[in-house]
Amino acid sequence: MSEKKIVYIDMDGVLVDFGAAIKDWFEKHPHLEERWKDMPDHIQGLFRNPPPMEGVIEAVKKLHESGKYELFIATSAPWGNAGSAMDKRLWIEDHFGNLFHKRMFITHRKDLLLGDYLIDDRTKNGAGEFSGELLQFGVNWENGIESEYPNWDSILDRLL
C-alpha cells in the first residue's frame, strides 16, 4: 500500500472567494473605499464570512474521500489584522467541520512546507518556491490573470 500524497490548499482565492468578499465590503462601506483600497486584508472581520469558491466544498470532499491524499490548509494571515487567523480557522470549521482539525498552517513561508502539491492562486509567500508541485489555481484576485487550473473541476481532473 502506498503512502498518501500531501496536498496543501490555500484559502484566499482558492477555498474562499476573497474577491467577492472585498467587493461586498466596499459596497456596504463605500465611504471607506479610498482609505482601504490598497490594503483590504487589514479590514477586521473580512475573513470571517466570505463565500466559498464555486464547487470547492464538493471538490475537497472528493479529494478526501478518494483516500489518495492527506489534505492540509496552508494560508497566510495579514500581520496587521490580528483577528484574521481566528476568522480563517472558524471559516474552515463552518464549511468543512473537522476535516481540517489540526491540519492548518498559517505561514508567510509556504516554501518551508514539505508535500506533494500546493493549490494556490499566487506565487507569493513562498508558494512559487514550494518543494512539490504548485497547482496555480483560478483567476488571481489581484491581477485578474487566469491560471492553468481555472476552477475546481480542473483540479479534480489533475488529481483524481
Located regions from the model:
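Acidic, Mg2+-coordinating phosphoryl-transfer loop and its flanking beta/alpha structural elements
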Residues: 119-153
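Generic beta-sheet signal
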Residues: 11, 74, 137-139
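Active-site neighborhood of HAD-like aspartate-dependent phosphohydrolases
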Residues: 1-47
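Conserved Lys-Pro-Asp/Glu-containing loop-to-beta segment of HAD-superfamily phosphomonoesterases
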Residues: 103-129
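Short catalytic/ligand-binding loop motif for oxyanion handling, primarily in non-cytosolic enzymes
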Residues: 16-18, 24, 71-73, 80-84, ...
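Charged phosphate-binding loop/patch that engages nucleotide di/tri-phosphates or the phosphate backbone
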Residues: 2-6, 50-51, 58, 62-66, ...
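Substrate-recognition element of Asp-dependent hydrolases with the DxDx(T/V) motif
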Residues: 51, 56-86, 92
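A short, structured active-site edge motif that brings together acidic residues
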Residues: 72-79, 89, 93-112
